[in-house]
Amino acid sequence: MKRHTRPLIIYLFVLLSFGCQKELPPIDTRWQHISNKRELSISGISPTTEKEKYLVVHDNKKKGQLRIGLIDLSADSLYAGLSWPTENLPIDLETLSDIPGLDNEYIAMGSWGFCYWIKLDLQSNKIDLIKEFRIPDSGPPLNLESFLILRRNKKIYAAWAHRGSDSEEAILFWGSISLFDEDITISLEDSVLINVPWPLVAKRHMSDMDIDNNNILWASATSDPGDNGPYETAIYKIGSFTFKNENINFNVAESFPKQFVFANNKVEALTVINNKIVFATDDENLGAAINISIDGY
């Protein structure tokens, strides 16, 4: 009997690890609470070179409030605030994009299109500001909440989005960006209107977005009726980017089936890492939380 104990244990481990993946609790219940402070609600998130750590930004507007922080899922205290590197603080940071090919370097963008190229030192937990630039023709009436840097071979592109509302569609823009020039410029190539079917009220069609390994664009659509909710979020595959002869184009999905639904949270931050999607919330007065989907579960 003893000689069969080890194979049985291994079999049970494999069964529990893989055979029961679909028996996980609904994703809407699998939140890890970050904070109940309004100041720490999360509006953008990106991975770092340490797989349990994520850089996040906050949409704060007042002096003395944090703009950026680090989530460490392996630590006892999940969140640590970081100092912004300059006295002049950004206003209303809404999204954070990692820069492909550059470890721990990111673009943080505010709702008026002001962008900040920053670098994170994970040894000291310090942020350096490398450069600033602005999205062309940004500012009111646009309210930008999504930004991406895309890299294909030696060509670098940018995509950004106006969130939209009940009365207007979101607008997804894309073009090329001269990221390594002394003065960074973005050349708009095209744009498209995005209108998702749900949520139904206080709608933000695109509150954040990221691209997966198949060039599919994922986006969060939220219901944001006020600082105390109630909130709802749906995650959609909006469409896909194509790259040909150094040109970038976007193909809108024919329909928008919901990929994930969060009945009580406002997901304003998401990042796609291979087979994993990380969601984080800006639940206003209700604080912030983080959630992870692996292989669609």
Predicted regions span which residues?
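Bacterial Sec-dependent N-terminal signal peptides
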Residues: 1-30
